[in-house]
Structures are given as C-alpha cells and as structure tokens.
Regions:
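Rossmann-like NAD(P)(H) cofactor-binding subdomain of soluble oxidoreductases
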Residues: 12, 25, 32, 55-61, ...
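Rossmann-fold dehydrogenase core element
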Residues: 42-59, 78-86
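Beta-loop-alpha module in the N-terminal Rossmann-like domain of NAD(P)-dependent dehydrogenases
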Residues: 1-46
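Alpha-helical elements of Rossmann-like donor-binding domains used by nucleotide-donor carbohydrate transfer enzymes
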Residues: 3, 15, 42, 68-71, ...
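Predominantly a Rossmann-like dinucleotide-binding segment in NAD(P)-dependent oxidoreductases
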Residues: 60-156
C-alpha cells in the first residue's frame, strides 16, 4: 500500500493523515484537509519531512469541463474576465442525508462542503485571490432531520450556514 484515501468525517482528517504519513504512506483526503490553518501547516510540515505527498479534494477542477474552460481562457476565446457571480442555495443536508450531523459541526458547513468546489474552480480559472470580504450567519441554532431513518431528530448547528462573500483576484477580476 503506497497511498491512503481518507474519506472520514472532517474532524478525523488530521489524525488519519498524520498516521498515514508516520507510516510512510502518501495520503489523499476528502475535504477539508484540516480543521484550521495551523493543522494544515502541521500536515504539510510532516509530509515535507517524510518526503511524502498529501492531496485533498476537490480535484473536480481537473475534469473535462474545468479544463475546457481553462483552455478557452488561456486561448483568449472569451476575453478578459472582470466580473462574475456564483450562487449555491439548498434546503440543507438534513433534508436528504441519512446522518447529517457532521455537516453542522465546525469544519463543515456550506463553504467547506460545497462552496469549496466553486472557489477552487474560480482560482483555477482566474488565478490567486488577493482580497476576500465575507459575512456569515446562522438562521437557526437547531435543524430538524427530514430524511430517513432519523426523521424528526434534532441537530445542533455549530457552524455558519449562510455565507456571502466577494473575491478580488490578483488580476483585478471580482466575483
């Protein structure tokens, strides 16, 4: 075994990645890589010391649609990108996931679970971000599961569930 694929809940990612590295294994993890920036630095430092690779989702930007969009931009087929927008709205994971609790814990929530796909694609297409402005909130401190088998159970919300932001890229594009 050369590579460990880590598909655990977010709060377990660091522990699994660190154990993989200590055992001489490369690791590819589900998102997020770590619960905070400091944990990410610890993982990076250990991987470098061990001469091992650590990768993390999302890797969807490497797919056909993302690569086609990147090629169109690189070939100047669509012109200069100056402004953009993206929106993601849903009822929440408690409406379809059979065990949605971890989505409402620190290290999860809409940005870490789904928004990261959009942000990664934007960085891939437009380039590095130089400024971020954001606000977040939580509409309610408790959610009711409406999917089986836990229909009616309550979940404590421990992470923001509503987020708005703007990104200013180094090339001055704004999304």
């Amino acid at each position: 075994i050369d590579l460990i694929i880590n598909l655990t809940i977010p709060s377990a990612h660091k522990e699994i990645i660190i154990k993989s590295l200590f055992n001489g294994k490369h690791c590819f993890s589900e998102k997020p890589l770590a619960m905070n920036f400091q944990e990410g630095l610890e993982i990076q430092k250990l991987a470098n010391e061990k001469g091992l690779y650590v990768g993390c989702a999302p890797d969807t930007f490497l797919g056909a649609a993302g690569q086609k969009a990147r090629k169109l931009i690189e070939d100047n087929r669509i012109g200069k990108i100056v402004l953009g927008t993206f929106n993601l709205m849903s009822h929440g994971m408690e409406h379809w996931h059979p065990n949605p609790d971890f989505f409402f814990k620190p290290g999860a929530g809409p940005v870490f679970d789904v928004g990261v796909y959009y942000i990664t694609q934007l960085v891939n297409l437009i380039g590095p971000v130089k400024q971020i402005n954001a606000i977040s909130g939580t509409a309610t401190n408790e959610r009711t599961i409406t999917s089986q088998p836990r229909y009616g159970d309550k979940i404590k919300v421990e992470t923001p569930t509503t987020l708005m932001g703007s990104l200013v890229f180094q090339n001055s594009a704004k999304v």
